[in-house]
Structures are given as structure tokens and as C-alpha cells.
């Protein structure tokens, strides 16, 4: 299949049905604390390693990774966008549960991996929202490591986590 062909050849050659000129790879790890009485999750540190090809402007790449981490934290812990029967129920930004600056740790350790790409501009691959999904999944795995509770639905709000912790006992 075209998708399998692209996945099997992520960087070394162009293929006819390529979905994108390059694929980016990243991995995140999260250190957190869980208050089992309230279900509140406090993110203490995030490690974010991302292969961006050539980092043309490393400071901007670092900022992009930090922004993706913040988005991933919101995605995992608080953000919601509700619809019913094709109608938007979450009508205002204030109701979406976007993370506040206090929800994002000061300790985000970005690791820029530079594996240049022959077809990217100046060897770049891109970074975009690459850290978003990896951060959310790293948070869920860290919650599992801390509590033994496997979260399968997002966002994992304090009330939802508190209920899952109570079921565990």
C-alpha cells in the first residue's frame, strides 16, 4: 500500500504516493506527581527529543517544541471541544480547558535531533505539532507508572482520574 511504502522509506527516497516529503520522529518522557485524593496531576518535567532534520533556527525550533509540549499537556489533562448532533456545544475559548501558564512546567528539556533530509529546505524536516501527541501519551504512561491506572480516554480531568483511582482499590 502507498502508506506502508512511505512508512518503510521514511527518509531515504521519494516515492510516488508520498504523503509528505519527510517524516519527523520524536519521543517524550514526563515526570509528574499525582495527588490521589484530588486526582490532580502536576507535571514537573518534560523531556522532548525531536528529529527535525536541520534546525535552521535552533531557538525557534526549541520554542516550537515547548509550544507543542504545552498543547500536549492541555490535550491530555484539560482540553475539551464538545459537539452534539453536528452542533458545537463548547462555544467559547474559556470553556475549552486550555492550559494556563501554571499548568506548563518551567523544566522542559528539549533535545533537538538533526538528521538532515535530502528533500527538505536546507535539510529541514519540520517540527510543527510533532511534540503534541507524544507529550499526551507520555503523560498517560507516567500516570500509569505512578498509580497503576491505565487511562484510555482524554482528557483525564482530576474528577475522572479520582474516580478511576477509587475503582482501582
Which role does the model predict for each range below?
Residues 1-169:
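C-terminal catalytic domains of large/alpha subunits in multi-subunit enzymes
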Amino acid at each position: 500500500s502507498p502508506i506502508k511504502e512511505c512508512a518503510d522509506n521514511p527518509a531515504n527516497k521519494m516515492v510516488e504516493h508520498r504523503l509528505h516529503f519527510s517524516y519527523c520522529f520524536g519521543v517524550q518522557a514526563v515526570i509528574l506527581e499525582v495527588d490521589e485524593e484530588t486526582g490532580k496531576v502536576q507535571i514537573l518535567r518534560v523531556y522532548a527529543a525531536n528529529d527535525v532534520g536541520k534546525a535552521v533556527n535552533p531557538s525557534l525550533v526549541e520554542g516550537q517544541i515547548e509550544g507543542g509540549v504545552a498543547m500536549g499537556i492541555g490535550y491530555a489533562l484539560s482540553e475539551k471541544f464538545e459537539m452534539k448532533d453536528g452542533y458545537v456545544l463548547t462555544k467559547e475559548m474559556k470553556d475549552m480547558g486550555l492550559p494556563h501558564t501554571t499548568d506548563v512546567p518551567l523544566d522542559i528539556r528539549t533535545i533537538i535531533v538533526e538528521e538532515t533530509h535530502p528533500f527538505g529546505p536546507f535539510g529541514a524536516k519540520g517540527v510543527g505539532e510533532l511534540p503534541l501527541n507524544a507529550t499526551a501519551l507520555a503523560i498517560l504512561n507516567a500516570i500509569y507508572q505512578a498509580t497503576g491506572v491505565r487511562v484510555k480516554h482524554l482528557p483525564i480531568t482530576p474528577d475522572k482520574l479520582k474516580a478511576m483511582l477509587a475503582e482501582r482499590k
